[in-house]
C-alpha cells in the first residue's frame, strides 16, 4: 500500500486524538488546519487549539485561515497537492471547491451511526432519544450537512450508566481506529461507498441551556435520559427555594405515585424521589449554586428542610399531607 499524503483539519481534543493516530500511522501529514487561536482563561490570552499544539509538537506545518471561502486560502490548500483531506470537528465550512481539491476528496469522522443523527450533537441526542447504540461513521464529505456517502461504520452499545461525557470518551477511542482502517481501505481501493437512506435521517441540533431545565411533567424515563445527555454540559437543572439546582445523576425508581408532577415523595441518604408525569425519578447527585457536586445524602445534611416530603419543587409550601407511595407493579 502506498502511503497517502494527507491534510488534516480539526480543532478540539477529540480531533487531536485522530491526528495522533495519523502521526503514528505510515501515512504522510503534509498540512494541519485548525481554527485561529482564541482568547481563553482569566487573562484572555490567545490559546492554541489542541490540534495546533499537537501539530507544532511534531513539527507539522499549521494553517489557520479564518475562512476557507477565501481564494488565497483555497490556493494555499491546493498547492499542498494532497491525496485526501481528513476533517474532524474542524468548525469551519468547507465550500465545494475545497471538497473537490484533494484527489480522493475530503472524509469526515462523525460521532454517530449515520444517517440516524446528523448535525452538531449526535452523542447527546442519541442518549436523550433512548438509543441502544451509537458509533462512528467515516463518510465522504459533500456540500450537505453530514449527508455524504458512508465509507465505514463501527458500533458501540449505549449502557445505562453512560453520559455524554463517557460516550465521548468511548467514541474518541473508537474513532481513530476507524479512521486508519478507512484510510487503509481507500489507499488499497477496497472501500465501497454506501448512500445514506434519507428516510432514516434526523438532525441532532446543538444543545441549548434552555433545554436543560427539567420539566417534571415528562416521564421519569425521559428525564433520566435527559440528565445523562446533558452531562457534562449544560447540566440539567431545576429551580427550588429560589435557587437553580443542577442534577448530575439520577435513576428511575420502582415506586409509583399519584402526587402532582414535581412533588417530593421521599428524601433520604439513598436519594430524593420526585413524582413525574409518569413514574418516579430518584435524584442521586446534585449541585447547589456556588458549591461542588455532592451526593443527595450530603446535601440533605445541610439543606434537609428544602426537601420535605410533600413539597412541590419550585415552591416553599407543602401541597398537603405526605404523599402515599407504593412499589410499581
Curated annotation (Swiss-Prot):
CDD domains xref list: FMT_core_Met-tRNA-FMT_N (cd08646), Met_tRNA_FMT_C (cd08704)
GO MF annotations in UniProt: methionyl-tRNA formyltransferase activity
Domain of life, source organism: Bacteria
Annotated InterPro entries: Fmt, Formyl_trans_C, Formyl_trans_C_sf, Formyl_transf_N, Formyl_transf_N_sf, Formyl_transferase-like_C_sf, GART_AS, Met-tRNA-FMT_C
Presence of keyword Transferase: yes
Range of residues in the leader sequence: none
E.C. number(s) listed in UniProt: 2.1.2.9
Binding residue positions for (6S)-5,6,7,8-tetrahydrofolate: 112-115
Primary role: Attaches a formyl group to the free amino group of methionyl-tRNA(fMet). The formyl group appears to play a dual role in the initiator identity of N-formylmethionyl-tRNA by promoting its recognition by IF2 and preventing the misappropriation of this tRNA by the elongation apparatus.
Family as reported in the entry's similarity comment: Belongs to the Fmt family.
The name this protein goes by in its record: Methionyl-tRNA formyltransferase
Organism listed in the record: Shewanella sediminis (strain HAW-EB3)
Taxonomy of the source species: Bacteria, Pseudomonadati, Pseudomonadota, Gammaproteobacteria, Alteromonadales
Protein encoded by which gene: fmt
